[in-house]
From Swiss-Prot:
HAMAP family: CaiB. It is an enzyme of class 2 (transferase). Its EC number is 2.8.3.21. Homodimer. The active site is at D169. Its main location: cytoplasm. CoA binds at K97, R104. It comes from Salmonella paratyphi A (strain AKU_12601). Belongs to the CoA-transferase III family. CaiB subfamily. It comes from the Bacteria. This is L-carnitine CoA-transferase.
Amino acid sequence: MNHLPMPTFGPLAGVRVVFSGIEIAGPFAGQMFAEWGAEVIWIENVAWADTIRVQPNYPQLSRRNLHALSLNIFKDEGREAFLKLMETTDIFIEASKGPAFARRGITDEVLWEHNPKLVIAHLSGFGQYGTEEYTNLPAYNTIAQAFSGYLIQNGDVDQPMPAFPYTADYFSGMTATTAALAALHKVRETGKGESIDIAMYEVMLRMGQYFMMDYFNGGEICPRMTKGKDPYYAGCGLYKCADGYIVMELVGITQINECFKDIGLAHILGTPEVPEGTQLIHRVECPYGPLVEEKLDAWLATHTIAEVQARFAELNIACAKVLTIPELEGNPQYVARESITQWQTMDGRTCKGPNIMPKFKNNPGKIWRGMPSHGMDTAAILKNIGYSEADIKELVGKGLAKVED
């Protein structure tokens, strides 16, 4: 396989990934591959570009490092070109409503006829099979959260609330990335392709697993938070200091002992309710739970965030200031690790946003390109798989492909 022009870097150099999907979930999977060195081709509709392009800034992050192919993959010669592309592809990711590709004639079996080693990742709201009532329904972040039991666990005691921004999309996209890599590892061992069925609601079901297990194995429903505080454990969650908010986790024998001395509760240590060796204070089951919250709230309210952080660092209590967005890039940890970076857009502007993550020591990822324009790489990609300029012109003339203006 001849690769498209791009630098060689990262742990996935030499891997070709193609994805078809709009907005966040499917493209996020492709984005991770692109930042780790894979050659990633982004398929867009010929007539209508990905709707994410209407956003002013986010696409410059979510579509960086990609090659843009505008092709009608379901019709006539456009379908033929897509299947030819699949012959040189390692991983194909599609995000749609249920078995949309199969309904339009592009089944796993058709793809494997062209490439028996192909890894195929199907990402949808409700999966590739199940009941007709659900399988073909559209789904977005909030739909997956609501259907999975994840949303009902979030928010305040008085009202559930979705976790934002777009949590289900990102969890599902990352699941597609990791699952496809696992499949690719096996394919290179066996030579046999794989098809992965990723249902967004099942991803969120698994992500919401912690307290669900108490219901499935005993019928206990975990209450939601009250003003950001852990529903079960005192000293855990969101708290207000004299000048802003922190989060903290009061966990550990020494941590509880020393903290209680500071807030005036040393006298309850070693009691039947708080015996020696206590590592967590249950908010409900421990009679002193409400008192712990009362004393902790009062102590924190009289101290600044900096004072609390300094003292908790001495006591080895996990704690962090709730940073505002403007505070991020000036934070010394962000600066030291270059967590926020800059890159050039295709039209020469400077864009600022999150850097590559995670950080590979020996084969680091990199940002080598901004978001390509609609159809920008169509001609180069088609030439790469054997199409002549005349062939490409014919596809464009039939409305089956779009090249850069």
